[in-house]
Structure formats: structure tokens, C-alpha cells
Amino acid sequence: EGFRGGNTFLWLFGIVSLNAFISIAILFAISPIIEMAFRYTTRFRLMELMNLEQPLLQDLMVAIPGTYHHSLVVSNMVEAGAKAVGANSLLCKVAALYHDIGKLAYPDYYIENQFNGPNRHDKLAPAMSALILLSHVKKGTELAAQHHLGDEIEDIIRQHHGTGLIKFFYAKAKESGENPRIEDYCYPGPRPQTREAAIVMLADAVEASSRTLTDPTPARIKTHIDTIMKGIFSEGQLDESELTFKDLHKLSESFARILTGLFHQRIAYPDLNKDKKTASDKPEQAKVQAKPEEKTEQRPDVKRTVAYAASSVMPGSSGAAAPNGPE
């Protein structure tokens, strides 16, 4: 009886294990079909896209490292913010990594990739500069479709600037005497339709503008974040996203923690090698100063030469004799 019971247990355990294995295999096999049929990005696909070895992310890292670094920081910000407000943190993180892939088309026209070189916009009309900046959203959605990033990520790329105005070049056009149409300097939208898209919009604007802070203390960082977020809110960009005032407060706190950690000051460590060098020079100086007396006693014929060598050692030097002094 015991033997039969043991066999039955092993048989049932084997069946259950096989069933679990087959279920997992089927799930992985049909995941792409589900994504295509229902235009839904599964969690498995998001985790795959988060791998920094993905071709698009590698292109960002090599071709536009400034934008790549910006995207990494934004991805950390949105992940923390999404967790704070109960949004989809994985979707936010992945979308943030890809939100600026459209900048691959004209990388040198974005300030984070110029590395103190000439600003190409200086030779362009404001309208042309605005057109280039506006194009990165359209180009980004095209690349997202080509690489099958999924509808949710495409939507966030399309919405992460909403219908915002490119204020710098619009003001520049007005100052140059033109009569610009405001719609020519606005992103086509739509405004963020989900909390995840709104979180990416806020983090993107906050991170990019925080680079202008000259003395990024925690208080100034927090004030800066609140100013940027209030501006976006007052423009109505968040009206369709379902973010609440409570959510905005939590996002501000989360962003502040990330940026404060990014901009934290480091301790200036003392140069220990300098102290070691000074200590090692002292015996040499004492040795050189002792040499003339020793040689004066043993070799009277070089007394004047040694005296000249000793007088050539300047105060505070390492004790080296003049070029013509004795060894």
C-alpha cells in the first residue's frame, strides 16, 4: 500500500509539473499574438524593452549620449513617481527610456548633444528651428511603430509634449520683427490621455529644465520642480490625464528626491599624496644640507664649490643643488 501510495504521489507531482511547464510555454508562445490582436503591450514585452541592450537604446547611447543620459534620469524619476501615485511604474519607466528616440533624426540640433560646440540654431530662422524640434515627436512614433514598441508607448511618445508651445523660438521670432502664428510653434498633441503619459511629460520637463540651476540646493530643486509643474498645469496640459492635486504633490516629492540625489555635493577629499611627497622631501633636504659640512672636512680643495652649491638651495625647494654643484 505504501509503495502504491508513493507511486501515486510521484505520478501526480509529475503531471502537475508538466502542466505548469506546458502552461508557461503556451503563455510565452501566444504573448506576441495577444499583443498583435489586442494591441496591448504585455509585462513580458515591457521587461524585454527595458533591457539597455535593445538596438534603439544602443543607438541613443552611441549617437546621442546626452539624450540617452536624459532619458535614463527621466526613467528613474517616472518610476518613483508612478509608484507614489499608484500608476503603472513599469510602463512609465520603459516609455521614458524611449520618449526621445525621435531625436536620432537631427541629433546635433538638441542642446544636450552639442557639448559646448556651436549651436546650429544660431544660423536658422526661428520657424525652421521650431520645425526641427517639433519633428522629433513624429519621428519618434514612426520609430516606435517600426520597432514594435506597442501602442501604449507610441501614445506616450506622441503625448509627452502635449500641445505645448516652444516658447524660446516663438519669442525669438517676435523679437526679430516677425508676426509668427502661435500654432506653428506648438506641438500637435494630443495632451496626455493617461496618468502614465502625464507623469512622463512632467518628469521630462522638470529634468531638462533642472540643468539650468546654478546652485542646485534641495530647497531650490523643490521650488524649481513646483514652478515647472504649476506652469504645465496652468496651461491645461494635464486636464485629460486624471491626475489629482494629491498626485501632483506626491510626484513633486518623488522628483525632488531623485534630483537631490543626482545633484548632491561631494566632499573635497584632501590630497594625501601631497603630504607624502612633502614628508619624503625632508630627508633629502637634510641630506643635501649635511653634505657640504662633510665634504668640507674631507676635501678642503672644494670648499668654495660646496659653499656655492649650498647657497644655491632656495628656501622651500626640494633641496636639489644647482646644476654646477657637486654630487
Where in the sequence are the language-model features?
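Transmembrane helix-loop junctions at the membrane interface of multipass transporters and ion channels
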Residues: 1-15
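Juxtamembrane or sensor-core-proximal signal-transducing alpha helices
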Residues: 2, 24-47
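Proteins with a high burden of low-complexity, intrinsically disordered sequence enriched in S/T/G/P/A and R
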Residues: 2-4, 43, 86-88, 102, ...
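Generic detector of short, locally flexible boundary/turn motifs and exposed helical patches
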Residues: 12-13, 23, 40, 173-174
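Hydrophobic transmembrane alpha-helical segments of multi-pass transport and channel proteins
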Residues: 13, 17-29, 33, 144, ...
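Divalent metal-dependent phosphate-bond-processing catalytic cores, especially two-metal-ion Mg2+/Mn2+ enzymes
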Residues: 34, 80-83, 98, 149, ...
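Juxtamembrane inter-helical linkers in multi-pass membrane proteins
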Residues: 40-58, 100
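Divalent metal-dependent catalytic cores for phosphoryl transfer on phosphate-bearing substrates
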Residues: 57-218, 222-225, 231-235, 245
